[in-house]
Design a protein with these regions (language model features):
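Structural motif
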Residues: 1-2, 24, 119
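Sec-dependent N-terminal signal peptides
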Residues: 3-13
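Intrinsically disordered, low-complexity
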Residues: 15-61, 126-130
C-alpha cells in the first residue's frame, strides 16, 4: 500500500510539471480528487467498473467533453461525459450505489458534482487511475 501511494505521489508530481490540472482516481476508495496548480480543489465519491468489467488502471488525458453525451454501446444518457484518451470509457454523471457497479466508466453520483467537475476540468487534463 505504501508503494502504491508513493507511486501515485511520484506520478502526480511528474504530471503537475506538465499540466496545471490533474485528476487522481482511487479505485479502492472509490474517490476522485481534482488538483489545480498542485492544490486539491474538488473531491467526490464514485462508482467505477465492477469485478468483471473493471475500470482500466493507467494514466490518461481527457480528450473529449460532451454535456449531453449518449452511449453508443448502451444507448443511455451520460451527462457531463469526459472521454479518456479516445477510449470507450470516461467520467460522467450516473448512478452511484457506493461500490464498483459500472461497465468500466467512472460514475459521479451527483448531477451538481458532475457539472462542477466538468466545468473545472479542461481538455488535456491528466487522469491517473489506480
Amino acid at each position: 500500500m505504501k508503494f502504491v501511494l508513493l507511486l501515485l505521489i511520484v506520478s502526480f508530481a511528474a504530471l503537475q510539471a506538465k499540466a496545471s490540472s490533474a485528476i487522481i482516481i482511487n479505485l479502492a476508495a472509490q474517490q476522485l480528487y481534482l488538483y489545480q496548480n498542485s492544490k486539491l480543489v474538488f473531491v467526490t465519491k464514485l462508482s467505477t467498473g465492477r469485478k468483471h468489467l473493471p475500470t482500466p488502471r493507467g494514466t490518461y488525458q481527457i480528450t473529449e467533453k460532451d454535456v449531453s453525451h449518449t452511449s453508443s454501446i448502451y444507448h443511455v444518457p451520460m451527462p457531463y461525459f469526459m472521454r479518456l484518451d479516445g477510449e470507450a470509457f470516461g467520467i460522467h454523471y450516473g448512478y452511484n450505489p457506493g461500490y464498483p457497479a459500472s461497465h468500466g466508466c467512472i460514475r459521479v453520483g451527483s448531477m451538481s458534482e458532475a457539472r462542477t467537475l466538468f466545468r473545472l476540468t479542461p481538455h488535456g487534463t491528466s487522469v491517473i487511475i489506480d
